[in-house]
A protein has these predicted regions:
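Short beta-strand segments
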Residues: 4-7, 35, 50, 126, ...
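Conserved C-terminal alpha-helix-loop-beta "cap" of PLP-dependent enzymes
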Residues: 121-124, 136-175
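Active-site acidic short loop of glycosyltransferases
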Residues: 27-29, 121, 129
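Conserved glycine-rich beta-strand-loop-beta hairpin in the small C-terminal domain of fold type I
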Residues: 82, 86, 102-113, 124-138, ...
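Conserved PLP phosphate-binding loop immediately N-terminal to the Schiff-base lysine helix
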Residues: 1-21
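Conserved core segment of the aminotransferase class I/II
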Residues: 24-103, 113-115
Length: 175
């Protein structure tokens, strides 16, 4: 068993929520944890990231050898950008003011959450992390039978890009 954990949003938490790394919950299981600066530091174009291997490595030596071979053959890190990691992660305990009341990310989350829930036929759970919200749409009220077609029509008519629920393996056309 190998656990892959994408923890790119580990520092974008609000409302007192704390991140727990999957690897910390199962120290005897081999885990590959992926992370980076693109989300937490809002520098998407930098493409600065890393992969951490933890847990029991005794049964995955060949797999790790393959990862090392692949990384030495195919990866070409952006060396100047790699220098920023040490400084960006320097004070991991500091709360990002943008995630607190009055901060831009917090206030945007509040605005979009309240705006969506004020529209008849739409509802959403308030997100506790990241930049995304997954609203539920009353498919019968809005006559939606295909969520992919709905977002394409919405893009054409309103010039607003959405991602349909099916893009997240949601089976009903209501997200």
């Amino acid at each position: 068993l190998i656990i892959f954990s994408d923890e790119i949003y580990d520092r974008l938490l609000m409302d007192g929520v704390e991140h727990t790394s999957i690897a910390s919950l199962c120290p005897d299981v081999f885990c590959i944890t992926l992370n980076g600066l693109s989300k937490s530091h809002r520098i998407a174009g930098f493409r600065v990231g890393w992969m951490t291997l933890s847990g029991d490595k005794s049964r995955v030596k060949g797999y790790i050898e393959g990862l090392n071979m692949l990384s030495s053959m195919r990866l070409c890190s952006n060396v100047p950008s790699q220098y920023i990691i040490k400084y960006a992660l320097g004070d991991y305990t500091k709360t990002d003011d943008l995630l607190l009341p009055g901060g831009r990310i917090y206030d945007q989350r509040e605005y979009i959450y309240n705006a969506l829930n004020s529209i008849d036929g739409l509802s959403a759970v308030k997100p506790k992390a990241a930049f995304y919200i997954f609203p539920k749409i009353d498919a019968k009220r809005f006559n939606i039978t295909n969520d992919e077609q709905f977002v394409l029509d919405f893009l054409r008519e309103k010039k607003i890009l959405l991602v349909h629920g099916g893009g997240f393996h949601w089976e009903q056309p209501d997200h």
